[in-house]
């Protein structure tokens, strides 16, 4: 191929995909250029079908919707990584107890401001608040990070006191302390998948790329970026 494969992804997988693409190319695979943007924007652009894209990486349910719409080739979806949602505070701030569901609920109720993302973790967090019966109580204190901006950035700036997002989005943000994952009974985990964009002339190459990214050889890179193989 004379031109790199063109890909698009959500921000949550930006670093792990860069590492996996580099490993793929190091063992002789085709060059890959992946643009990472907010997941909602990425899905919208693939759905619009106006760009010459070859591969898309998004949350599993987003890939399913694109496949149902005919924008991702049928049967091409490959689950790649599982990412856990964690809680974080500004570096040096007191660490609230989040070890149980009741403790986390109390921490949320006590926080003067709460940050969450536009991605799947944010959607799941809002659903959790609704199940707890506190959605209305905390509504005025919740802040949604702009698309493509890590919640950790808002935490580090002091714009929110308690934030939630994928671990992979927060581990490289300076100025925050990660408290840890949510308790097992209310864990918010997201599977990210890849798919062949319908109409690409490089479908076979993309399938080989996705097979490599799902292989045991890719597990180490995933764990280094705070994720687990799917």
Regions flagged by a language model, labelled:
Residues 1-35, 40-49, 57-69, 74, ...:
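Exported/periplasmic ABC-transporter solute-binding proteins
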């Amino acid at each position: 191929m004379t031109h790199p494969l063109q890909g698009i992804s959500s921000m949550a997988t930006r670093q792990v995909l860069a590492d996996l693409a580099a490993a793929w190319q190091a063992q002789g695979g085709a060059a890959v250029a992946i643009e990472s943007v907010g997941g909602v924007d990425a899905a919208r652009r693939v759905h619009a079908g106006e760009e010459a894209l070859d591969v898309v990486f998004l949350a599993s349910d987003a890939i399913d919707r694109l496949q149902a719409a005919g924008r991702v080739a049928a049967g091409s979806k490959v689950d790649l990584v599982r990412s856990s949602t964690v809680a974080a505070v500004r570096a040096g701030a007191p660490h609230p107890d989040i070890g149980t569901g009741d403790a986390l609920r109390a921490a949320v109720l006590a926080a003067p401001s709460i940050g969450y993302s536009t991605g799947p973790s944010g959607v799941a967090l809002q659903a959790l608040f609704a199940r707890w019966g506190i959605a209305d109580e905390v509504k005025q204190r919740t802040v949604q990070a702009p698309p493509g901006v890590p919640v950790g950035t808002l935490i580090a700036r002091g714009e929110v006191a308690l934030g939630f997002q994928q671990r992979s989005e927060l581990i490289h943000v300076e100025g925050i302390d990660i408290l840890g994952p949510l308790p097992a009974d209310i864990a918010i985990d997201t599977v990210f998948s890849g798919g062949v964009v319908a109409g690409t002339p490089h479908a076979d190459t993309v399938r080989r790329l996705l097979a490599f990214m799902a292989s045991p050889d890719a597990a180490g890179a995933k764990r280094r970026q705070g994720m687990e193989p799917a």
